[in-house]
C-alpha cells in the first residue's frame, strides 16, 4: 500500500487529479490489493472495483484442511490484511466486483459479498459469461457504466454517517474520526457515528479507549453543551475523548500509549 500512495503522490505532481474522483481498481493480484486498499482506506476512494484475486487468508488458502492448524496468535494477525473482517468500512466506499464465470478466484467476490451482507451492504457482482481468469468485453462496459454513475457524484468527504471497523491502530482513521487507543489490539474495534439534523452527534464504540473528532470536517453545526452522545453518555463538544473506568470524558490531547 505504501507503493500505491507513493505512486499516487508522484502522479499528482504531473497530472491534474481530482482527489474526490479517484477509484481503486485491480484484477487478480491487483484484485487482492484492491480489496485491501478499499476496506482499510475507504475514505480516500470514490469507488472500488476488484476482479478475482483473494480477500482473506483462511478460506482462500484452505488453511484448516491441513495439520497442524496455525497458532491463534498467527490467526489474529491475519486481521492486519484480511478485507472480510473490515467489510463494513465499504459503507464509505461503493464497490463492484468482477469474476469470470469459470474462474476459481470468484471465491474472493463471493466471500466479500457474504461479509458485506452481514454489514447490511450488497455487492454488485458482474460475471463474465464463459470466462476463466480474464475479463469479458461486455462486462467491462457494464462495470464502466456503473463506475461513471458513482464517480459523477464524487466522494463524500464529510459524511453524516460513519461505520468504521479496525483491528489495529495502523488503520485508525476514517474521514473525521480517528481511533487513538484500543482496549485490546487485534480484536475487533468499532466506531460508529451519526450526525442528526446537523445538530447532534451520536457515537457508539466497541473495544476503544480513546478517539478524536476532526471538528473542521465533521458536519456538526452545534456547540450545545450536550450535542454529543457517546455510548449513551451526553458530553460537551470536544476534539478528543478518553474512556476511564467505563465512562467517557473529553481531554485536551491524545495519548497513544493505550
Protein language model annotation of sequence segments:
Residues 33-37:
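Hydrolases whose catalytic domains are alpha/beta-hydrolase-1, hotdog thioesterase
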Residues 92-99, 124-125:
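Catalytic His-Asp charge-relay segment
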Residues 1-29, 39-45, 89:
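Gly/Ser-rich "nucleophile elbow"/oxyanion-hole loop immediately N-terminal to the catalytic nucleophile
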Amino acid at each position: 500500500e505504501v507503493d500505491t500512495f507513493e505512486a499516487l503522490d508522484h502522479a499528482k505532481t504531473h497530472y491534474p487529479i481530482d482527489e474526490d474522483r479517484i477509484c481503486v481498481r485491480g484484477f487478480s493480484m491487483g484484485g487482492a490489493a484492491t480489496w485491501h486498499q478499499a476496506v482499510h482506506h475507504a475514505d480516500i476512494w470514490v469507488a472500488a472495483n476488484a476482479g478475482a484475486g483473494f480477500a482473506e487468508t483462511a478460506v482462500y488458502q484452505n488453511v484448516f484442511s491441513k495439520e497442524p492448524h496455525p497458532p491463534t496468535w498467527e490467526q489474529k494477525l491475519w486481521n492486519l490484511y484480511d478485507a472480510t473482517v473490515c467489510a463494513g468500512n465499504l459503507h464509505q466506499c461503493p464497490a463492484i466486483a468482477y469474476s469470470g464465470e469459470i474462474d476459481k478466484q470468484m471465491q474472493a467476490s463471493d466471500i466479500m459479498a457474504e461479509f458485506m451482507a452481514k454489514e447490511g451492504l450488497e455487492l454488485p457482482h458482474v460475471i463474465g459469461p464463459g470466462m476463466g481468469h480474464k475479463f469479458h468485453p461486455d462486462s467491462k462496459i457494464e462495470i464502466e457504466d456503473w463506475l461513471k454513475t458513482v464517480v459523477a457524484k464524487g466522494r463524500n468527504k464529510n459524511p453524516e454517517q460513519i461505520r468504521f471497523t479496525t483491528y489495529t491502530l495502523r488503520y485508525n482513521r476514517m474521514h473525521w474520526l480517528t481511533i487513538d487507543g484500543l482496549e485490546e489490539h487485534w480484536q475487533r474495534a468499532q466506531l460508529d457515528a451519526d450526525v442528526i439534523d446537523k445538530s447532534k452527534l451520536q457515537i457508539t464504540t466497541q473495544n476503544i479507549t480513546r478517539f478524536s473528532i476532526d471538528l473542521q470536517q465533521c458536519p456538526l453545526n452545534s456547540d450545545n453543551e450536550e450535542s454529543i452522545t457517546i455510548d449513551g453518555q451526553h458530553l460537551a463538544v470536544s476534539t478528543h475523548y478518553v474512556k476511564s473506568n467505563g465512562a467517557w470524558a473529553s481531554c485536551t490531547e491524545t495519548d497513544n500509549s493505550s
